[in-house]
């Protein structure tokens, strides 16, 4: 399984940031409990920065091998619910950068919150809507959004540079037009983080963000000059301790630099597993 195709971390990391970002940015309440016993953090090995930095216990049998009925292909049924499929559609959004194909689950008009997930290299819009792969985490995100008046979107895009930025900025403009008061959380896996930082620096789209999630991803010093940084948009990093693509020491250094440049900035860092494939909670 490639670094870009994360297996277990994404859903519960989203759940963690729903409270972190939406409460900080808009005063919204946390989402109701949904399969929390299956997706909650295991033991905390260490904690620093008043809890903003945590190292989470990792066990391969518990967190990977024991979770799937068919290894890396189908999670055990107890981790998923197919209720949200009733709210799921393959759609095309019309944007200033042209049509953008995406999977959408939830309330497309007047959503209470919006989550966009941008895949890494080799992924596509279907990855973030798969119910049974990735430990059931995407299914959990889908249900948290669809069953609580939110909207979860996983788009296709042309690249991780100018064209992709234009498409995602256009998509954000389109979905915000249908739910102008909804906090919008942009989440990015692996190389998709290049677009997270580009959108943060986009003069219009960057100011519309309510939260950023970087999963096993990269860093960008340009963030410090971005509209998102100036707005103090909350940032959440989830990273593996031995990530072979994006070294954890560099991502940790970037986390520290954010705290140094803007004391009290709402930023959190979680370490679990060895790479993006093992991120779970």
What residues fall within each predicted segment?
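Alpha/beta-hydrolase active-site loop
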Residues: 158-179
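Short beta-strand/loop motif that positions the catalytic acidic residue
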Residues: 236-239, 243
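Short alpha-helix in the alpha/beta-hydrolase fold that links the catalytic acid
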Residues: 247-258
């Amino acid at each position: 399984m490639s670094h870009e195709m994360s297996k277990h971390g994404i859903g519960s990391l989203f759940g963690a940031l729903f409270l972190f970002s939406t409460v900080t940015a808009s005063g919204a309440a946390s989402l109701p409990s949904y399969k929390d016993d299956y997706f909650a953090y295991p033991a905390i090995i260490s904690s620093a920065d008043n809890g903003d930095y945590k190292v989470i216990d990792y066990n391969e049998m518990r967190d990977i091998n024991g979770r799937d009925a068919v290894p890396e292909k189908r999670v055990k049924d107890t981790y998923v619910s197919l209720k949200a499929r009733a709210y799921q559609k393959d759609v095309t959004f019309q944007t200033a950068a042209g049509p953008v194909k995406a999977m959408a689950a939830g309330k497309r008009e007047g959503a209470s919150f919006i989550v966009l997930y941008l895949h890494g290299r080799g992924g596509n819009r279907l990855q973030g809507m798969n119910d049974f792969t990735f430990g059931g985490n995407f299914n959990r995100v889908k249900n948290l959004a669809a069953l609580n008046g939110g909207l979860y979107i996983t788009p296709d895009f042309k690249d991780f540079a100018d064209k992709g930025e234009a498409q995602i900025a256009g998509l954000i403009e389109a979905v915000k037009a249908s739910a102008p008061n909804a906090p919008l959380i942009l989440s990015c896996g692996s190389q998709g983080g290049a677009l997270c930082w580009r959108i943060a620096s986009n003069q219009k789209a960057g100011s519309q963000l309510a939260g950023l999630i970087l999963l096993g991803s990269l860093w960008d010093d340009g963030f410090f000059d971005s509209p998102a940084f100036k707005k103090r948009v909350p940032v959440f990093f989830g990273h593996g301790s031995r990530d072979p693509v994006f070294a954890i020491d560099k991502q940790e250094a970037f986390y520290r630099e954010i705290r140094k440049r803007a004391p009290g900035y709402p930023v959190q860092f979680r370490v679990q597993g060895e790479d993006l494939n093992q991120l779970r909670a």
